[in-house]
Swiss-Prot record:
Matches recorded under Pfam families: SmpB (PF01668)
The protein's name in its UniProt record: SsrA-binding protein
Organism this protein belongs to: Mycoplasmopsis synoviae (strain 53)
Gene Ontology MF, one: RNA binding
GO cellular component: cytosol
UniProt entry keywords in alphabetical sequence: Cytoplasm, RNA-binding
CDD domains linked to this entry: SmpB (cd09294)
Underlying gene: smpB
Signal peptide per UniProt: none
SUPFAM superfamilies: Small protein B (SmpB)
Record PROSITE patterns: SSRP
Domain of life, per lineage: Bacteria
Length: 143
C-alpha cells in the first residue's frame, strides 16, 4: 500500500470514530498527478448529495499544460448500504473527512474516509499535553 497523500489536520482537529474505504472517480490527468504524489487534502471534506458522496476542495496538481480545474468535486464510490450508514451518522453532528489517499494492492486509488467529531480548543490542548507526557514516559523507560 503506497500512500499518496494524508490529511494531517484531520487527526489534529477531529476525534476519529469510524473509517471507511472508498474508490474515487478520476480522469486520466488526475491519475497521473496521483502517481506523482501531487495531491493535497489540507482543506478537503466530503458531502452527500442525492445519495452520492463527493470529495470537495481536494487539490490535484495540473499535469503538463492542461487547462483543467484542480479543485473540482470528485465522486467517491461506495455501496448504497455504506452511504446510508454514513448518512445516519451525519445526522448525529459528525463530520465526514478524507484522511488519506493511497494505492491498494491492485494498484487502484482508494480514499480512506473517517467519521469524526470536531475538537474544541481545550480538547486539543488536553490532547497535546497527554501526548507530551507519553513521550516523556517513553524516554524515561528507555533509559
Amino acid at each position: 500500500m503506497k500512500i499518496i497523500a494524508t490529511n494531517k489536520n484531520a487527526k489534529r482537529n477531529y476525534e476519529i470514530l469510524k473509517t471507511f474505504e472508498a474508490g474515487i472517480k478520476l480522469e486520466g490527468w488526475e491519475v497521473k498527478s496521483a502517481r506523482a504524489s501531487s495531491v493535497e487534502l489540507k482543506n478537503a471534506y466530503c458531502s452527500i448529495y442525492k445519495d452520492e458522496v463527493f470529495l470537495k476542495e481536494s487539490y490535484f496538481k495540473k499535469y503538463m499544460l492542461l487547462k483543467v480545474e484542480e479543485t473540482k468535486n470528485r465522486k467517491l464510490l461506495l455501496h448504497k448500504k455504506e452511504i446510508l450508514k454514513i448518512k445516519q451518522e451525519l445526522q448525529k453532528n459528525l463530520s465526514l473527512i478524507p484522511t488519506k489517499i493511497y494505492f491498494n494492492s491492485n494498484s487502484l486509488i482508494k480514499v480512506e474516509l473517517a467519521l469524526g467529531r470536531g475538537l474544541k480548543k481545550y480538547d486539543k490542548r488536553e490532547k497535546l499535553k497527554k501526548e507530551e507526557v507519553e513521550k516523556k514516559l517513553k524516554k524515561i523507560l528507555k533509559f
